[in-house]
């Protein structure tokens, strides 16, 4: 993955080029067609996902709670706290996502601590 793709995501925007290069090595691109479920409430949280392009709807217990778009991140809480997913995210248009798996996020603690700290801050803000 190219580091310029990561820089467009606010979570990574202020990261150093060196840290972004470390993330880019193991970041994966993923697509979710319109109408499909990206993550399911109650499911295992195995990846952090950032929206590169497209839109999605977030619901909890069947109730709409938020809309997401380019630059938004989801799945981060379960990555750090080893919790089940707290909401369902459904693509309202084709989603182009950047995915970081659980192992890769944990690896950021050592390889890119500044980015890992930003993820921790995001989790705290959403509690």
Label each PLM-derived region with a short phrase.
Residues 61-63, 70, 79, 100-103, ...:
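Surface loops and adjacent helix of pleckstrin homology
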Residues 52, 62, 81-83, 91:
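Short loop/turn positions at the edges of beta-strands in beta-sheet-rich folds
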């Amino acid at each position: 993955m190219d580091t310029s793709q990561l820089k467009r995501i606010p979570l990574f925007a202020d990261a150093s080029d060196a840290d972004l290069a470390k993330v880019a090595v193991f970041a994966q691109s993923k697509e979710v067609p319109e109408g499909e479920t990206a993550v399911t409430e109650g499911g295992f949280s195995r990846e952090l996902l950032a929206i590169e392009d497209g839109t999605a709807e977030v619901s909890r217990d069947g109730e709409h709670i938020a809309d997401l778009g380019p630059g938004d991140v989801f799945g981060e809480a379960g990555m750090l706290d080893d919790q089940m997913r707290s909401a369902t995210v459904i693509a309202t248009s084709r989603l182009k996502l950047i995915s970081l798996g659980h192992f890769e996020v944990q690896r950021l603690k050592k390889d890119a601590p500044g980015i890992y700290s930003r993820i921790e801050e995001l989790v705290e803000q959403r509690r």
